[in-house]
Structures are given as structure tokens and as C-alpha cells.
Amino acid sequence: MPQMAPISWLTLFFVFSITLVIFNIKNYFCFSYNSTETSQNLNIKQHKLNWKW
């Protein structure tokens, strides 16, 4: 079985690292969260507590 030269391992490491970084950046910036739609659907009632000591 032929052995890989160290420069080939380094190139392979950089290719996989750059692929991982690009994939993570793509997932981070492509995720869109519609906060206006969910805030209209949720009817959260706020109960104000009036403490009388």
C-alpha cells in the first residue's frame, strides 16, 4: 500500500477544514427566523403583581 507524503496530508486537512468552515458559514447565514409571525401567534398574558405590604 503506498504511503501519502506529509504535504498530501496537509492539503487534505486544509481542504476538509475549509469545507467545514464554508458549510458552517452557509448554515449560519441561511437560517432565517420569522419572529413577527411567531410573536403574533403567541398570546402571552403578562400578569403584573401588585404587592401591598
From Swiss-Prot:
Belongs to the ATPase protein 8 family. Mitochondrial membrane ATP synthase (F(1)F(O) ATP synthase or Complex V) produces ATP from ADP in the presence of a proton gradient across the membrane which is generated by electron transport complexes of the respiratory chain. F-type ATPases consist of two structural domains, F(1) - containing the extramembraneous catalytic core and F(0) - containing the membrane proton channel, linked together by a central stalk and a peripheral stalk. During catalysis, ATP synthesis in the catalytic domain of F(1) is coupled via a rotary mechanism of the central stalk subunits to proton translocation. The keyword Repeat does not apply. The keyword Methyltransferase does not apply. This is ATP synthase protein 8. Its main location: mitochondrion. Pfam families: ATP-synt_8. F-type ATPases have 2 components, CF(1) - the catalytic core - and CF(0) - the membrane proton channel. It is found in: Mitochondrion membrane. GO terms for cellular component: mitochondrial membrane; proton-transporting ATP synthase complex. The lineage of its organism: Eukaryota, Metazoa, Ecdysozoa, Arthropoda, Hexapoda. The chain crosses the membrane at residues 5-25. It is a single-pass membrane protein. One of its GO terms (biological process) is proton motive force-driven ATP synthesis. Keywords: CF(0), Hydrogen ion transport, Ion transport, Membrane, Mitochondrion, Transmembrane, Transmembrane helix, Transport. One of its GO terms (molecular function) is proton transmembrane transporter activity.
